[in-house]
Every structure is written in structure tokens, then in C-alpha cells.
């Protein structure tokens, strides 16, 4: 009994000492902690009003839609034109299991441009590209 307690205590100490070392170097969470630059705040407001219900606050996704702060949506894979088409026409589900995205009513191409700039900033801040 004394031996197994000693072994358990040693294992506990090792796990406490090793856990922090293992977590070093892991990529940061996809959430962005920086303050949104003034020139992107309109895009942020439009994103919150038109996109965040499905794509989450700061684009991290929800149970209803995928995260836009994700490697799949980097500019080389989903360029800005893809975001414009998605807003104007909707998108058939092809990367995720959330279902089809409907077109977004009442959003102009200029609105989407501002949203894109905000999303690209979020992606860059999170290290997506």
C-alpha cells in the first residue's frame, strides 16, 4: 500500500511537471485578443449583425456554422470573391456538416468587402495566414 502511494505521488509530480512543458509551443487559440483597429470596426459591426449568429463572435464558429478563422478560409483557398458569392447566392455545404448557407438579404457588396477585411484581420491575428 505504501509503495503504490509513493508511486502514485511520483507519477502525480511528473505529470504536473510535464504538462506545462507539453503545452509550450502549441498554437494559440483561434480567438483574437487584440483590439479591433478603428478602420475595421464597421466591418466588425456588420459581421456581428449579419454573420455572427452562425459563424460565432470573432468568427470562431457555432453549432450552426463553421469557423471562418480557420485554415480552410485562408485567402489562398477561399478568396474574397468566394465570400462575395456566398453572401449574394448562398453556398451549398461542402466542407462542413452544418447544412447549406442561405444568401444574406440586405447586405451590399460594399458591406461584404468591409466584413471580409475584418475576417481577414481576425484570421491574420490568429495565425491562419
What residue spans do the PLM features occupy?
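Axial heme c-ligation environment in periplasmic c-type cytochrome domains
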Residues: 62-71, 89-116, 122, 127-129
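Conserved Rossmann-like nucleotide-binding pocket used by diverse enzymes
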Residues: 18, 47, 69
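Post-cleavage N-terminal segment of exported redox proteins
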Residues: 1-38, 86, 118-129
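The canonical Cys-X-X-Cys-His
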Residues: 43, 48-57, 115-119
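Cys/His-rich metal-chelating microdomains
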Residues: 25, 57-58
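Gly/Gly-Pro-rich "capping" loops immediately C-terminal to redox-active cysteine motifs
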Residues: 33-34, 38-40, 44, 60-88, ...
Amino acid at each position: 500500500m505504501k509503495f503504490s502511494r509513493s508511486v502514485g505521488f511520483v507519477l502525480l509530480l511528473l505529470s504536473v511537471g510535464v504538462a506545462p512543458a507539453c503545452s509550450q509551443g502549441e498554437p494559440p487559440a483561434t480567438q483574437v485578443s487584440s483590439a479591433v483597429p478603428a478602420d475595421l470596426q464597421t466591418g466588425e459591426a456588420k459581421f456581428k449583425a449579419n454573420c455572427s449568429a452562425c459563424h460565432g463572435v470573432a468568427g470562431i464558429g457555432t453549432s450552426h456554422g463553421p469557423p471562418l478563422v480557420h485554415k480552410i478560409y485562408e485567402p489562398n483557398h477561399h478568396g474574397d470573391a468566394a465570400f462575395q458569392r456566398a453572401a449574394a447566392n448562398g453556398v451549398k455545404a461542402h466542407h462542413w456538416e452544418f447544412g447549406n448557407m442561405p444568401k444574406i438579404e440586405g447586405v451590399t457588396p460594399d458591406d461584404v468587402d468591409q466584413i471580409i477585411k475584418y475576417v481577414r484581420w481576425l484570421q491574420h491575428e490568429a495565425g491562419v495566414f
